Regions:
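Acidic donor-binding segment of Leloir-type glycosyltransferases
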Residues: 21-67
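Short, flexible, basic/aromatic active-site loop/helix in glycosyltransferases
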Residues: 136-159
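Short aromatic/hydrophobic "clamp" motif used to bind/position activated sugar donors
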Residues: 87
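Non-catalytic, C-terminal membrane-associated alpha-helical segments of glycosyltransferases
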Residues: 226-236, 240, 244-289
Length: 289
């Protein structure tokens, strides 16, 4: 009997998926109760990846998506065929750092618990955005509380959510809220999911395990204006969908780019300075739209 179905969505992720799976099986502490499903979103080297995965990890179920419908749509394919009552969503650039699954599954013994998350560590050794505050908060308060929450490992499930790079959720509950919104191609899925889960299950609980850590290679990506526009498109879509005024949040982000750019200038980091200048330009485009 499977207790946990782990879904990993790939898209040209050959550099990451093998090390990701290596860490999954290295720290798998639930044995055959783990089901792993890799869904591929039409990678250019899919066949080579499929052959290697089938050879090295014959127990992994590999599914080729019919098209690249984005992060949410691809994960939904895996969730629908998952056989376990609990589903884990994991990015291919995630690495487990310790035995993880058994402890997180214990949280679901409480029937009110519908999702669990863990502490995200970046390749720099710093903590990632493990905890994010609700979009419904005033933007300044949201930033301040997020800093406090990250420093203190304090998680309030009524006003916060955790990073989507790796989290567990009850499949039945996720199905009832419609799974991932497939209108979101990539980014901003987490706030939308957590808003819908809380609305559907007002008495639910969400567990955060700061003592369980995983590595996320998010800080190793180079800045991409195209990807940043996709991110802001997702953000504004979620704001509008849930009737939240997104403009104050964008204004605060503009001021943050000034602060971070000044810090980069003082460190004589021209590349970082140019990145924040480009981010500010893109944010202004969204404010004018």
């Amino acid at each position: 009997m499977k207790l946990l179905s782990l879904i990993i969505l790939t898209y040209n992720s050959e550099k990451d998926i093998y090390d990701c799976l290596k860490s999954v099986y290295q720290y798998n502490n639930i044995g055959d109760a783990l089901e792993v499903i890799v869904v591929d979103n039409q990678s250019s080297e899919y066949e080579a990846m499929r052959i290697r995965l089938s050879t090295e990890y014959p127990q992994v179920r590999i599914v080729q998506n019919t098209h690249n419908g984005g992060y949410g749509q691809g994960n939904n394919v895996g969730i629908r065929i998952a056989t376990a009552p609990i589903v884990a969503i994991m990015n291919p650039d995630v690495r487990l750092l310790m035995p993880t699954f058994a402890a997180m599954l214990q949280g679901f013994a409480d029937k009110k618990v519908i999702t669990c998350g863990a502490k995200q560590i970046l390749t720099s050794g710093q903590q990632g955005w493990s905890i994010v505050c609700s979009y419904k908060m005033p933007p300044i308060l949201r930033l301040v509380l997020r800093r406090i929450a990250l420093r203190t490992d304090h998680y309030n499930y009524q006003y916060m959510y955790f990073a989507g790079a790796f989290f567990l959720v009850r499949k039945e509950s996720f199905l009832k809220v419609g799974l991932f919104d497939e209108n979101l191609f990539m980014y901003s899925e987490e706030p939308d999911i957590f808003i819908r889960l809380r609305k559907q299950f007002p008495d639910c609980k969400m567990c955060y395990y700061p003592n369980i850590q995983y590595l996320h290679k998010a800080d190793s990506r180079e800045f991409s204006p195209k990807r940043y526009r996709v991110q802001l498109t997702g953000d504004t879509y979620v704001f509008k969908k849930h009737h939240i005024d997104y403009r104050p949040h964008l204004v605060v982000n503009i001021w943050l780019t000034y602060i971070f750019q000044l810090r980069a200038i003082l460190k004589h980091n021209a590349i970082e300075s140019a990145t924040y200048r480009e981010q500010r330009k893109i944010i202004r485009e969204f404010l004018r739209s």
